[in-house]
Regions:
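Conserved alpha/beta enzyme-core scaffold
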Residues: 1-285
Length: 285
């Protein structure tokens, strides 16, 4: 059953050094605030999982939190590369980063398999792809019914999944809407799950076909309005396109990046203080 906790307490209690951690969101509802708190608390040796790692993963990797990344595509969407990710892979800064690359269909199916308690996922998606040449975990299996040769990949079962959502009720049930990726599957596949939300209400009033995660599947719910910034939360906040553009020069240089992390994450007590400091800096320009 989910507890209503501060984000600080949830990360302290449920994220451990050496864990496999998935921070999932697709286009919107990206759990940036939780990623910042992981950096702030100095968690390390993490295996990070994400279908489309973007800015928060660049920050986690550059801050030295990660030893491995399991992913399918990574970049600053609409802008370019993740420079801290590239520096870690190409030049081992701040230390070496192991990478395990998959296709989108592969990783989505791996989450589904994990949520179903299965050891692996099966798919057809690797016909004509070179990914099996660089990822030895992509295997071939023969269908016992048709004889067709298929691809098989290990299921993804994170120690901790972290997502951002629009609403939770006081019992810890969570409601998401808008564009969804694999948040539901990632949450159900994990041993523990932290959800940051825009608001906590008495009654979810979930519309038909909405995605509702039950309290029994979650570990903690944290009230963090705006916690998906710079991505958006459908119905609550807009995407901060300027931040995505501004991140590119910050991340390109090690000293500039380190100064930004020290000022805006280590130099703030929580995400509310981070947002206030960011707003003041923006107004001063």
């Amino acid at each position: 059953m989910a507890e209503i906790l501060s984000l600080h307490d949830a990360v302290k209690q449920f994220v451990n050094d050496g864990d496999t951690v998935a921070l999932e969101g697709f286009t919107h509802l990206i759990p940036t605030a939780a990623g910042h708190e992981i950096i702030r608390q100095g968690k390390k040796d993490l295996t990070l999982v994400r279908m489309t790692p973007d800015l928060i993963y660049d920050q986690l990797i550059g801050a030295g939190c990660a030893r491995k990344l399991i992913f399918s595509w990574g970049g600053n969407p609409g802008v370019g590369s993740l420079h801290r990710l590239r520096d870690a892979v190409e030049k081992q800064w701040p230390h070496a980063l192991e990478i395990e690359e998959h296709s989108h269909a592969d990783l989505a199916n791996a989450y589904v398999a994990g949520a179903s308690g299965l050891p692996f996922a099966v798919l057809r998606a690797y016909a004509g792809s070179d990914l099996p040449k660089v990822n030895p975990l992509i295997k071939s299996v023969t269908c016992p019914f048709t004889g067709e040769v298929l691809a098989a990949v290990p299921s993804v079962r994170p120690d901790v999944t972290v997502i951002h959502a629009q609403k939770a009720d006081r019992k810890g049930n969570v409601l998401l809407w808008g564009i969804l990726g694999v948040q539901k599957e990632a949450a159900l596949a994990a041993k523990r799950c932290i959800v940051t939300v825009e608001e906590i209400v008495d009654d979810l009033q979930a519309p038909m076909n909405a995605c509702v995660l039950p309290t029994w599947a979650l570990s903690a719910v944290c009230h963090v309005p705006g916690g998906a910034h710079p991505s958006y939360a459908h119905g609550y906040t807009e995407r901060d396109n300027r931040f995505y553009q501004a991140w590119d020069p910050i991340a390109r240089d090690r000293e500039t990046f380190t100064a930004w992390i020290n000022e805006y994450i280590h130099g703030t007590a929580d995400f509310n203080e981070f947002q206030a400091k960011l707003a003041r800096a923006s107004e001063a320009k």
